[in-house]
């Protein structure tokens, strides 16, 4: 036989049932027991889906009310002491307070789960952190699954990855020092799972796919020797998100009973493990993307493995399926509008079925599933030959770009003189990042237009009214470079995706970002082309309302790529450059329309960095090229801005400088301008606008706070190159606090201008 299992399942439900229940509970509209009952029903459905597909185990312990790393903090007694909670007697309300904060304590920090778009809650480790086992979360889920008659495989993140994902707080120390006292707590937790009947336990160690310091890598041997010796269960060590070839010798000698490899992200690593003499779980179905697999091609890899390994071969998705939407079958609109694309997709339930087919083929031969294999082949062939996907003119345009197409005509020093001559801006010019408050009226108008209750003319008139309001308010505030406020945009990526060829949208393709927040990424399925102007009329209309300078607003190619499900039949770098070239048509049209300050937002550029530093240069080279291509051909006196959200820039500053944007605005207020110091040390050559207040809070900053930040900025950036702006877009704020915040920003700026004049 061939064992088939999954590493984890989506938690939120087919139609985001958990999200809506959580939010009703937080608003006190749903009783705790009702939330618990709904969660139990979702878990039971998840297990049934796995069992119905003939999975040999169901994954348990992967379900969470907010985040699996928060659950692990509770299970190891490592919740932040500052909350004053007892992890053994933690209430559901207290659990949510850890994630969302309360009146006395800010929430646990959140950051990206490796290089995915999921966010986990970062463990806070102190030198005196005391771990205590509390396996209730896992034990209860095992009991539920066993009552329902399932064979269980508990899933838990391993001790080294858990420590790796945390941060040291307080007194200076290295969190690695806590490993010795964490391991016995893991032993206790795992033995509690064994006591409930767990025969196999999956321990996730994705940290093996990053650049681990030597002492961390070396620690695996002793840690797993201890776990293996003291826990009477078979241990499956799961790695994913990248290659672990560099650890092959260590992993083959590790005291575990099986190893899971991500053969989608890193198929080449299989060679290093072909002589592995224990269970090898082959992650052959993509757990991070939505494309249907060519099952014949997958079997070409698996059949020789099966011959070699026999029953020691397990099959699985590459990683947890929490990164994929739930069920393609509910996408009836997509099936109707684009049946070809629909036939190329696989969501979680379809991926589980693909694994079921592979299991049967390995056990009984391909003929036993020839109908399914033929359907898979037909879809793969149709996709490979589709004229809707492959547009020769796009490949031709990319191939025939002029030499140095991604370079501006003149260096920044010459461009800025031409720009300053016509812009005629005061010292410390002010602007905002782009969006203004998206009011209930705006959202209602958009929803009514989408439903057909509002005509195109009525909708556009309501958007024009909003734009006029935004322009007039900025004029009253005396901002220098204005924006139109983006009332017509529901989302900074979706808006452009809807207007570019090569993109499609699902109705229920939601994936969890964090807690109750879900995102519905666009699908980039074909060559990207801009059929007509996307933003020009809105910016042109806004400019017609004012004599002040109006800034055009676009989302950059790297961010569009990062926040989408991306086609997997050509390199990501090629897709990114296609988007950049398509955007360049928009930039040139804006320029022709008289919009000569254009912002190309790239909040996600750092997110795209590969897990291993050795791969950074390649990524940064093509990401930078794609960004520069998006403004190719603009005149020297057109000013290109970019905006980047809260990031550590120190290690990629040369690449940021190489983007060669005339002005970069960055989110810095929460770090007290610390991020800006790196730009100063690096001697960043172009103009900079560090955010002077945090837009994520409705709080109105004091004049003293903004002045403090601006003076710090002036210590780092020459006054001639310093812009003044909020941290980020103002979409999520209300009008009253927006005006109040900008008034303070303007009054401080004017005070400093007078002083510096």
Curated annotation (Swiss-Prot):
UniProt-listed GO biological process terms: methionine biosynthetic process; methylation
Superkingdom of this protein's organism: Bacteria
Record CDD domains: CIMS_C_terminal_like, CIMS_N_terminal_like
Associated pathway: Amino-acid biosynthesis; L-methionine biosynthesis via de novo pathway; L-methionine from L-homocysteine (MetE route): step 1/1
Cofactor: binding comment: Binds 1 zinc ion per subunit.
Keyword field contains Repeat: yes
Keyword DNA-binding: no
Record Gene3D superfamilies: 3.20.20.210
Active site: 696
Binding site for 5-methyltetrahydropteroyltri-L-glutamate: 16-19, 112, 517-518, 563, 607
Primary enzyme class: transferase
Amino-acid positions noted as binding L-homocysteine in the UniProt annotation, renumbered to this chain: 433-435, 486, 601
Catalysed transformations (reactions): 5-methyltetrahydropteroyltri-L-glutamate + L-homocysteine = tetrahydropteroyltri-L-glutamate + L-methionine
UniProt xrefs under InterPro entries: Cbl-indep_Met_Synth_N, Cobalamin-indep_Met_synthase, Met_Synth_C/arc, UROD/MetE-like_sf
Transmembrane segment boundaries: none
Residues given in the record as L-methionine binding sites: 433-435, 486, 601
Cofactor: Zn(2+)
Function, in words: Catalyzes the transfer of a methyl group from 5-methyltetrahydrofolate to homocysteine resulting in methionine formation.
Family: Belongs to the vitamin-B12 independent methionine synthase family.
PANTHER family in the cross-refs: 5-METHYLTETRAHYDROPTEROYLTRIGLUTAMATE--HOMOCYSTEINE METHYLTRANSFERASE
The name this protein goes by in its record: 5-methyltetrahydropteroyltriglutamate--homocysteine methyltransferase
Organism name: Histophilus somni (strain 129Pt)
Gene it is expressed from: metE
């Amino acid at each position: 036989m061939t064992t088939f299992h999954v590493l984890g399942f989506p938690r939120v439900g087919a139609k985001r049932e958990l999200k809506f229940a959580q939010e009703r509970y937080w608003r006190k509209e749903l009783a705790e027991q009702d939330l618990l009952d709904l969660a139990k029903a979702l878990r039971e459905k998840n297990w049934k889906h796995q069992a119905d597909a003939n999975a040999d185990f169901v994954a348990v312990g992967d379900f969470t009310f907010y985040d699996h790393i928060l659950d692990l903090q509770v299970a190891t007694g490592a919740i932040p002491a500052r909350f004053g909670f007892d992890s053994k007697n933690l209430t559901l309300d207290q659990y949510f307070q850890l994630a969302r904060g309360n009146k006395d304590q800010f929430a646990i920090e959140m950051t990206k789960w490796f290089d995915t778009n999921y966010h986990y809650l970062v463990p806070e480790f102190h030198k005196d952190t005391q771990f205590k086992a509390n396996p209730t979360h896992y034990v209860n889920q095992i009991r539920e699954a066993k009552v329902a008659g399932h064979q269980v495989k508990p899933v838990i993140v391993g001790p080294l990855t858990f420590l790796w994902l945390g941060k040291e707080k307080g007194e200076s120390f290295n969190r690695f020092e806590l490993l010795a006292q964490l391991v016995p707590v893991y032993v206790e937790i795992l033995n509690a799972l064994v006591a409930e009947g767990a025969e196999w336990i999956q321990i996730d160690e994705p940290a093996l796919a990053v650049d681990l310091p030597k002492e961390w890598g070396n620690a695996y041997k002793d840690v797993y020797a201890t776990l293996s010796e003291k826990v009477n269960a078979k241990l499956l060590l799961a790695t994913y998100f990248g290659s672990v070839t560099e650890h092959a010798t260590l992993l083959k000698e590790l005291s575990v009973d099986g190893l899971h490899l991500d053969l989608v992200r890193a198929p080449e690593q299989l060679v290093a493990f072909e002589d592995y003499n224990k269970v090898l779980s082959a992650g052959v179905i993509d757990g991070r993307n939505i494309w249907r697999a060519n099952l014949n091609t997958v079997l070409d890899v698996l059949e020789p493995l099966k011959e070699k390994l026999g029953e020691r071969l397990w099959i699985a998705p590459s990683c947890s399926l929490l990164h994929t939407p739930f069920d393609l079958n509910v996408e009836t609109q997509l099936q109707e509008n684009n049946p070809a694309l629909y036939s190329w997709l696989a969501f979680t339930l379809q991926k589980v079925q693909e694994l079921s087919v592979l299991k049967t083929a390995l056990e009984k031969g391909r003929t036993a599933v020839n109908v399914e294999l033929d359907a898979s082949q037909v879809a793969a062939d149709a996709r490979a030959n589709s004229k809707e996907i492959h547009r020769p003119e796009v490949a031709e345009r990319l191939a025939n770009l002029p030499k140095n197409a991604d370079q501006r005509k003149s260096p920044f020093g010459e461009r800025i003189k031409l720009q300053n001559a016509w812009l005629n801006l005061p010292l410390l010019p002010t602007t905002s990042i782009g969006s203004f408050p998206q009011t209930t009226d705006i959202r209602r108008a958009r929803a009514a237009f989408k439903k057909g209750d509002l005509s195109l003319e009525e909708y556009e008139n309501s958007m024009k009214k909003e734009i006029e309001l935004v322009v007039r308010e900025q004029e009253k505030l005396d901002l220098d470079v204005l924006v139109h406020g983006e009332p017509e945009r529901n989302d900074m990526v979706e808006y452009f995706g809807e207007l570019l060829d090569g993109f499609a949208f699902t109705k229920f393709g939601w994936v969890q970002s964090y807690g109750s927040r879900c995102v519905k990424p666009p699908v980039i399925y074909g060559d990207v082309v801009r059929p007509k102007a996307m933003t020009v009329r809105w910016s042109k209309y806004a400019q017609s309302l004012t004599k002040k300078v109006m800034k055009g607003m676009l989302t950059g190619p790297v961010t569009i790529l990062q926040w989408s499900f991306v086609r997997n039949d050509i390199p990501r770098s090629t897709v990114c450059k296609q988007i950049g070239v398509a955007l360049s048509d928009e930039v040139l049209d804006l320029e022709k329309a008289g919009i000569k300050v254009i912002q190309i937002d790239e909040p996600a550029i750092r997110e795209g960095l590969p897990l291993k530093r050795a791969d950074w240069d390649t990524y940064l080279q093509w990401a930078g090229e794609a960004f520069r291509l998006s403004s190719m051909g603009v005149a020297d006196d057109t000013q290109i801005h970019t905006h980047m959200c809260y990031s550590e820039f120190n290690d990629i500053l040369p690449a940021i400088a190489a983007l060669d944007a005339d002005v970069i605005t960055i989110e810095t207020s929460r770090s007290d301008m610390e991020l800006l110091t790196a730009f100063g040390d690096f001697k960043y050559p172009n103009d900079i606008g560090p955010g002077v207040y945090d837009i994520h809070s409705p709080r109105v900053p004091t004049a003293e706070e903004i002045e403090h930040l601006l003076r710090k900025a002036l210590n780092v950036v020459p006054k001639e190159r310093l812009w003044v702006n909020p941290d980020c877009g103002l979409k999520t704020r209300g009008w009253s606090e927006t005006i109040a915040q900008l008034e303070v920003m303007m009054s401080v700026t004017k005070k400093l201008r007078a002083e510096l004049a």
